[in-house]
């Protein structure tokens, strides 16, 4: 087991060459590299025609949702830099470099979709996003994260928070976007959503892996972990209090059940019993499960209706 990651970690002897020290993280990095993609490969402008097909309440909800995702993605990027500095194992450092690279793509995709939802009115988009970040549902999540990170008594607790951001906060949003596909809306946006959700599955798996194997056995008490999971679940549910009532697109109940299932799956990944006991979603659930377990190539389900060329498409 590796030494605990703390301020003293960086004082260990640094190796000026590469050798495999963390084969599990090396595998996840290789999986991510093999499935790199760029925002320029997807003609998001093709979805512009669908903006008018949303009701006023649905359009407001998806504008709000993408404002939240963009803000949350930036918070993850800030935390990545802090976490990567805690380790000297090059497999972990290389993995985080790869994750930061794909997070840039996610950020650019979210920005393009936001602009699409405002019919390319950049001024309106900027004003809306600034206001949305002050919305109580978003503010509670951001404040909770900042407060919990500041109060975290250990690196292990910070990793629990990362697992919750990537595995709980994001998963409900990805599911809400995936429901657009069931009505043949925003087809290209849904393609990018599939890829982003798969990327985040790898990122969550990496956080669980580091938590389990590279923190020197340091773990918060189970009661503390369950407390954080309950809080994250409650906050995720509150965000969907903004969902339009009577929408023919969204199934909020199914999304809520999916979040509970995701929480139980993440608890299993860090060697803890389930909290909710919720079964996996049915085959009619529109989002491919956020899991990296099959280690398949992410592009196997990818449509060819985009610009650019996929190289090394296994």
From Swiss-Prot:
The chain crosses the membrane at residues 160-180. The keyword Transmembrane applies. It is a single-pass membrane protein. The active site is at residue 110. It holds the Pfam family Ribonuc_red_sm. Keywords: DNA replication, Host membrane, Iron, Membrane, Metal-binding, Oxidoreductase, Transmembrane, Transmembrane helix, Viral latency, Viral reactivation from latency. GO terms for biological process: deoxyribonucleotide biosynthetic process; DNA replication; release from viral latency. Fe cation 2 binds at residues 103, 166, 200, 203. It comes from the Viruses. PROSITE patterns: RIBORED_SMALL. Belongs to the ribonucleoside diphosphate reductase small chain family. Ribonucleoside-diphosphate reductase holoenzyme provides the precursors necessary for viral DNA synthesis. Allows virus growth in non-dividing cells, as well as reactivation from latency in infected hosts. Catalyzes the biosynthesis of deoxyribonucleotides from the corresponding ribonucleotides. This is Ribonucleoside-diphosphate reductase small subunit.
